[in-house]
Amino acid sequence: MKTYKKLFMFCMACLSLSVASAQTFTSYTTTESESWKAGKQPMKGKGNSTPLVVVSGNEEGVIFRAWGTTFNELDWDAFNQLTRDEQDEIMYNLFSPDGDLHFTHGRVSMNANDYARSWYSCSEVSGDFELRYFNIERDKRNIIPLARAAQKYYPQLQLFMSPWSPPAWMKINQDYPVLSNRLNKQDPRKDYVLYMDEGQSADPDEMKLLGDRSGVFPRRLALQDYFIKDPRYLQCYADMFCKFIDLYAEQGLPITKVMYQNEAYSYTPYPGCAWTAAGTLLFNNEYLAPTLAKKHPKVELWIGTFNTNRLDYVEKILDDPTLQKNVKGVGTQWECRNNLPQLRKRYPNLRFMQSESECGNGSMDWKAGEHTFFLLSDNLGNGCDEYYNWNFI
């Protein structure tokens, strides 16, 4: 209510100034060469064009609920290169209700993602099915402090979590990446297990930016799950999700949503895990959903994050009637935004989230800004009610 009152008073003040200054108002424009240029514009008493949008009051649409950003180890390293005043300015502008962006949510990964300093998991003891040695000590040093810096300006911060890779000991290749390359230590002889043929390297589109890819992505689908589908492993992994939620709650950071896997269709040389449709349904329906319902009934299970434009493959998962009962919504990013119009129409009872804004190559130029504006317009216009930035520093 206070925010609306301030907005009303500000608008009235602007109106008074306009009237007092011969019916003019101050406009601000930003171009590629100049930012926030102020100028005086005359007030027109009568419009000279037809309305672009006519609202009758009977329209139905999606209510936008929240947006936020991601907390990563390398973000924390960059954050610590700043002065305390610079840190406070950034977090105020991102998270304060009186700041610029008004972020209210954040994203974290269980175990290492591709913006970790090095690869790790919360469970490094092979065969620890009782999770005696499961811990978030690495998060306490490098991720939780960054989230707390955000909480300083928005104490009600909520998180959603998805892993990039299970612990290496839970995967058939016993390593964090899916495929080998010159930047990791995986034995290249293991690469054949993805497609079950010799000599197959990574998808040539895998490490390209979205605009440089063409056709369907991925070009080929994994023929087997990289997660070991033994019941002990599957149940232990579901228990890890709940343990992670517990430990973050002890740090004053509530996780309110989880997804089983980040980008299951990127067969990466960094932490990742390939899943088939059958494996996805098995883990979510028979292990993760019931375990969450028992231990954390208020935490929402979403399915994702989908990063493929293979609509038929996504529908193969979402058409499952048991899954539809178990999940609250769908996380989409990168290629999957091409499927949003069809998915919204086919699954009207599910919510949709844009779970990772395309960060590009960090050029921070006008073209990148236009692309981000397009992403916001495209995802929100096609029904996403939450939107998550990737790195914010």
What are these regions (language model features)?
Residues 59-64, 99-101, 152-154, 295-296, ...:
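Extracellular/periplasmic catalytic domains that process cell-envelope and extracellular macromolecules
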